[in-house]
Amino acid sequence: MNTYFRFEWINGEENPCEYNLWRMFQIEPKPKSGANFMKPNLPNTENFSTASSSKIRQLSEQPSCSNSYKKLRHEMGSDNSNIDDPLDDYDDRKKKLAKKKAAFKAKKGYTTGQNKSDNSFEFEVEKSMDRKEPENGDEEESTEDDYRHAYSSVEKSLRKISLLPIQRPSHHTFCVFCSESYPPVEFHFCIFMTAAQKEVNQSVNEFLGKADTINKKMLESLKKFIHTSKVDTIAKHSRMENTSMKKNSDSPKKLKRPSTDPNPISKRFRHISDESTSSSSLAKNKSRSVTPDALPFAMIDSQEHRTQSGRVVKRPNLFCHKEVQIRKETVQKEGLKKKRVNKEKEVEQESTILLGISESERKRNRNMIRRLLANGFELPGDDYVLPPLPADKSTWTREQHKMDIYGPIYCALQSFKPAYTTDMTSEFLEDDGDTEFKSENSESDSDSEDEQKVENDVASSADDIEFIEIVEAERKMDQNLAQQVRSSFVTTAENTENNMLMEDDSSEQGSSKFNRNASRRSTENIEFITIDDDDDDDNDIEIIA
């Protein structure tokens, strides 16, 4: 009759392949009819962990023999405290043994804990059992340790193979690190195996899957096969794991935010001066060709900060001594600007009180007269006589008020026509006195100077007199066209404004129709007038009305 063993796994979190986390039970096969006769009564592997935890909970909840004995004595009426109980000594001895066991486990690196969900005891293995990493220059010792560790793991696996039953079904898989044979299922409880351990397990299963029985000859051949093929791979894998752990430990940590310091300038400058003395910091900044005096400021500018999304953001250091000086200078400049503005406002108020004209208006008038003189305007002489004005100022028009303010210059401007299409008189008449006079572009001055040079060169030659007369005639025609376009544009703008007001008063709901009609009218009233001079491309005029 064959003997079968059942293994139950206590829910271990760290390493499920530890022998302390498994319980072995001997099973006697139950006689069954048919093909199921002589099959081992193995537990259900799908609910393996829950079944074992419930079994442990039931065992822990069962009362001990001492408690049952005391209960019987209480029911019999012999519950006397003076009588010596033979089981009291047993309980005391049991407690002492439990204390010794806990001290032994603490010394070995085990700590006992209780799972809140399953109420089942479990052992948490500390990380002190792991092998230490070799220091720099101890590569030979590390390789020897790897081979020693691989050899010992192979020996352990072979010892576990020898403990297996001799007869077992061939389709059952075998875990070297759990020392158990189990039917092939999707759920396998050796989850925390390394890559090398999985390779050894796979090779052993391939070797044992071909035979139903295990002999000493098979074990010896398996030993040779594992020693020749798997010791090197296990050592190599362990070495690679050590190097990966080293890289993770040597990886730079994330930058922390600078702590708030009551005197951050001195601390920051001290830190930078210490770095500047070191050779590594100087080697880093050689590519920038930074002098030692400018080194702290350059190093602060090179500081970068990464956001959570990974975007690089330059972090300006506001506590640098040089940046503090720059900020002070900017504050002083802003204060001086404010003082100037306040003084100008006071001067304007005084000039308006005394003369009736603000200082800004007087500046506008001066600039306008300069531009007019550049375009060919001649100032009136002393003998110029103004037209008479009525005595009652309440009846004066806007033009009469301006004649009174500006004098003979305004009267001379009414009859003045500049050499180009930009009508300076219209801009002057439309000015209210509060808005500044703005020229169209400074390019008109440069264009006028260039054209005068060209005309002087042409006039020097006697053959081109007819050409000059043609150019002057074309210029007069251009002025007339520009005036016609300007007048038509003003009338169309007034008509569109009146139509818009009428449509707004009539209906608020037809806003979309109004927008369409307005866009159509604006496109209908637009006229493109282009005047092309074949000689000068810069003087071509394109007017949109």
Curated annotation (Swiss-Prot):
Coiled-coil annotated spans: 325-354
Biased composition (Polar residues): 111-120, 508-517
Signal peptide coordinates: none
Region (Disordered): 108-150, 236-290, 430-461, 493-545
Superkingdom, taxonomy of origin: Eukaryota
Record has Coiled coil as a keyword: yes
Function (record text): May play a role in transgenerational epigenetic inheritance.
Protein name: Protein hrde-4
Gene label: hrde-4
